[in-house]
Every structure is written in C-alpha cells, then in structure tokens.
Design a protein with these regions (language model features):
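Acidic, divalent-metal-binding catalytic cores of TOPRIM
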Residues: 1-183
Length: 183
C-alpha cells in the first residue's frame, strides 16, 4: 500500500524557468507571500527554477534549451529585456530568442516587457524606494535577506503597494499567458 503519492499535473501547475538565482529568489518570495496572504484558496499555479543565465553564444543557448526539454515537456522561460532600444538585436535576450527560433522544437519564451514595458528586468517590478533597499544590484545575499524580511516579518509594510501591485500584475499575466499554452 502506498501512503502518499506526489503527482505533477502540468495543466494545473507549471514550471517557469528564470534567468538567475536573484530572479528566482524575488519571484519565489512574492509567490509564497501572495499564496499565504491573498491567494490561499487559489494559489499561484507555478514554480520558478533558475537556469544560471542565458549563456553567451548561440550554441550554448541551444544546449540550454535542449536541457530544459529534459526537465519539462513544454518548457517556459521568463527572460529580461536587455535591449537598450527597440532596434537592439545584439542584446542577450534577443540572441536567446533567435537561438530558440533556430531550434526544431522551440520553447516558450515570456519576456518581462511583454507584461509591462517598464519591466526590463525583475528588479524593475520594485518601486524606486524598494529597489534602492532590496534590489539595487543582482546580489543573492541581498535577495535572501529580502526573502527573510518579507516572509517572516510580522509587519505588512516591508514593501510598498506599488511593488506588491507590480509583482501581482506580473503573476496574473503569467497565469493568463500560460493558460493559453497547450501542454
């Protein structure tokens, strides 16, 4: 007799791969925060996993894409928007999208700026004040300290409403867009 089984239903719960550990930390922290406070009855239906960056050349990017297929049948990656302007095709995010398009079976790429053109990187979801305090550089120690403070502080004012609303907007967009993707 089996006392407990764990099943993963990708139609109800998706894995979203993110570029790095700080992105993972911020997104996972807000997911836990919202699930405990606002979405207890309808938790956010995805888990974030970091992929250690987009890599530096097309071959390495394509190796990463192949590895993602080993982890998930329908990989979804949330990437920054590294373009300096709309015409910047040399940005790493654009190179990654091109490398993906060259694959026989491309993965799904979600770009932050498609949610809101102000969101070029995860840190842009923070208000100016919160960014200065918690996300001024991509430092994992700062991100971990933020996680501890947000999740374990009894205070509800660790971050401002603008920051909460921005992350909520991002999560709602991810839920909406992933519901359009067939598993």
């Amino acid at each position: 007799m089996v006392s407990q089984n764990v099943f993963h239903n990708p139609q109800k719960h998706r894995t979203i791969f993110v570029e790095g550990t700080t992105d993972y930390c911020y997104l996972s922290t807000f997911k836990l925060y919202f699930n405990e406070r606002e979405f207890k009855n309808n938790p956010i239906p995805f888990t974030f996993l970091p992929i250690s960056g987009l890599k530096n050349d097309s071959n390495e990017m394509q190796k990463t894409i192949k590895k993602l297929y080993e982890l998930d049948n329908n990989p979804i990656v949330l990437i920054d928007d590294d373009r300096k302007c709309d015409f910047d095709q040399n940005a790493k995010s654009e190179q990654f999208k091109r490398a993906n398009e060259e694959m026989p079976d491309p993965i799904t790429i979600l770009q932050l700026s498609s949610c809101d053109n102000r969101f070029k990187q995860i840190e842009d979801c923070f208000s100016a004040n919160d960014r200065e305090e918690y996300a001024k550089n991509k430092c994992i120690e700062l991100a971990m300290a933020f996680k501890t403070r947000l999740l374990y502080s009894e205070k509800d004012d660790v971050v401002g409403e603008e920051t909460k609303n921005n992350f909520k907007k991002l999560f709602e967009w991810i839920v909406w867009i992933t519901n359009l993707i067939k598993c």
